[in-house]
Regions:
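Solvent-exposed loop/turn segments at secondary-structure junctions
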Residues: 13-16, 29-30
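Secondary-structure end/capping motifs
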Residues: 31-112
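Conserved C-terminal helix/tail region of periplasmic/extracytoplasmic solute-binding proteins
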Residues: 102-139
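Ligand-binding "clamshell"
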Residues: 1-12
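Short secondary-structure boundary/hinge segments and terminal tails
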Residues: 16-18, 80-81, 121-123
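A residue-level marker of the well-folded mature domains of exported/periplasmic proteins
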Residues: 2, 17-18, 65
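Small-molecule pocket liners
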Residues: 5-6, 19-23, 27-28, 100-101
Length: 139
């Protein structure tokens, strides 16, 4: 318990795949301007690597955007958000998207029967991964 807050549940410890974050765009953009999408995904992947490799820099950026200089709060946020939840290879999986759709089904019943693959395109990240680009970021 820090700063008077109690952790009720560590979602990551449950081992349930879940798409916590993602990049959203119209599907048409991935067809009309794939280079733009590729550049954005590349920059996002580089930013993740920088945050994971350079804690001092990441804490400075987080402090600016979270509008706090509290070192304990920033360190805890870094450990949870960057080290625990940010994936080195930011891939969404069918299982993770299925969990999201199952959650949505209470409000949007047709989500339960939707095909998870319809909602994400992992080809850009997979290209970065297969080219060795992501591994090179961590060397």
């Amino acid at each position: 318990m820090k700063l008077g807050h109690r952790s009720l549940l560590d979602v990551a410890s449950l081992g349930i795949p879940y798409a916590f974050t993602g990049i959203t765009t119209r599907g048409r953009l991935t067809h009309d301007d794939p280079d733009l999408v590729r550049r954005y995904v590349t920059a996002q992947t580089e930013a993740i690597a920088r945050a994971k490799r350079d804690k001092t820099f990441a804490l400075k950026v987080m402090g600016k955007y979270l509008r706090t200089a509290n070192p304990a709060a920033l360190a805890e946020s870094y450990d949870i958000d960057v080290q625990k939840y940010m994936l080195k290879v930011p891939l969404t999986t069918v299982e993770a998207m299925r969990s999201v759709l199952d959650d949505l089904a209470a409000r949007i019943p047709k989500a339960k029967d939707s095909e998870p693959r319809k909602f994400f395109d992992d080809s850009f990240v997979r290209q970065l991964q297969s080219s060795g680009f992501i591994d090179a970021l961590y060397r």
